[in-house]
Curated annotation (Swiss-Prot):
Gene3D superfamilies: 3.30.300.20, P-loop containing nucleotide triphosphate hydrolases
Protein name (record): GTPase Der
Source organism phylogeny: Bacteria, Pseudomonadati, Pseudomonadota, Gammaproteobacteria, Moraxellales
SUPFAM superfamilies given in the database record: P-loop containing nucleoside triphosphate hydrolases
Biased composition annotated in UniProt, kind: Basic and acidic residues: 455-473
Amino acid sequence: MSIKPVVALIGRPNVGKSTLFNQFTKSRQALVADLSGLTRDRQYGDATYEDKAFIVVDTGGIGEADDGRGDIDDYMSEQSYTAIHEADIIVFVVDARAGMIGADAEIGKFLHTLGKPVYVVANKVDGVHDSAPAEFYALGLGEPYPMAASHGRGVGNLLEVLTADMPNQENIIEPRGLKLAIIGRPNVGKSTLVNRLLGEDRVVVFDMPGTTRDSIYIPYKRDGKDYVLIDTAGVRRRGKIDEKVEKFSVIKTLQAIEDSNVTVIVIDAHEGIVDQDLHMIGYALDAGRALVVAINKWDGLTADQKNYIKIEMDRRFNFIPYVKVHQISALHGTGVGNLYPSILRAYQSSMFEVSTNRLTQILQDAVTANPPPTVAGRRIKLRYAHIGGHNPPVIVIHGNQTGSLPKSYQRYLENQFRQVFKLEGTPLNVVFKLNENPYANKSDTPTKAKTQQLRQRERNRAQKFTTKDKKPR
């Protein structure tokens, strides 16, 4: 499947994990910088090396103890535990200047128990003897990779090794059907909704939060249409780590969203709409995914509570007026069947096609009804439009002075396209391109070339008449 591998960076504080994270992600901003209610010492980013994509996690929370005593729990936070168990590959960053200390040895022992690929990176080798990394052979995790992450030295070699067995993006086999992701905070009813959508008990449901693990793909048919449900529900029973209740799996949520065509976010009506719900909605929109909102456990509310939630929906969802919101009860099945039409409309909207002629006509109608403003005495001209992509749909508009088009006018055009094509549930990207003169960088413009051609004809004609009029000697 096309789910991205996960690489977790672990190690003591100040060994260079964040610097290596920035090198991997090319200093891009972390995908999730601060999700409400989550430990803030983890960052998540997208990385690509030679067309091989993966998610990189910068973990925190490993202690400074250097006496080598105590259990691994003394050194590692619950969130770091979670990141390590979700990862496909572990990069263990150590400090070549400081040398190996007790905490490094304790973490190394723990990593031996995981059965996952582990790469030891001896960072900060600049200014130390070439033999300094050799000390970390004692960890028993293979050859240490010398690196100076702050200068980028050694990063390329590590990436080449890390990605050697990862699939190329163009070689990934996609499952057949509309890919539907079910996301939401813990215990909002995701697994119950999955069972309702599938119409059978395909997923075990638990009442306590934190019983979710890896995303799984469930292909199924409904009304003759193919679907692939990307579900983050399952059972955690994989050793000591699983005795801890996981608060939230950011990695699996990001993977499910990115790999979906349509995302359904489940919100607990009893808890109301919280910031974490909005963060997940925001990420789905940033990823360009079509969206449907399901307010679950609706039947358990009083009339006053329902009125309050409706007011909250109007207030907190005002930035997504094009997204359909459903009130459902996954447990009893109320309203669940109504999700499918919204899911299909959102998907169709995200993949819509239209001819350039038709799109340009809609553009011209919008411009006629409400012309663009003038800039420096010249009116901005928008000449034609065409489709530039899908999921999310992209409309490309060509014209002059497009860089000066106000945001308010850009939103006006987006709303016009939404209304005409009845786009529901999907972000819409409207991109503006400046018309370029193809002869701008050439010595001859069409006008100049035409002039020279006419002059040459005149010279030829004059020469012809001169020759004709000459008398023979």
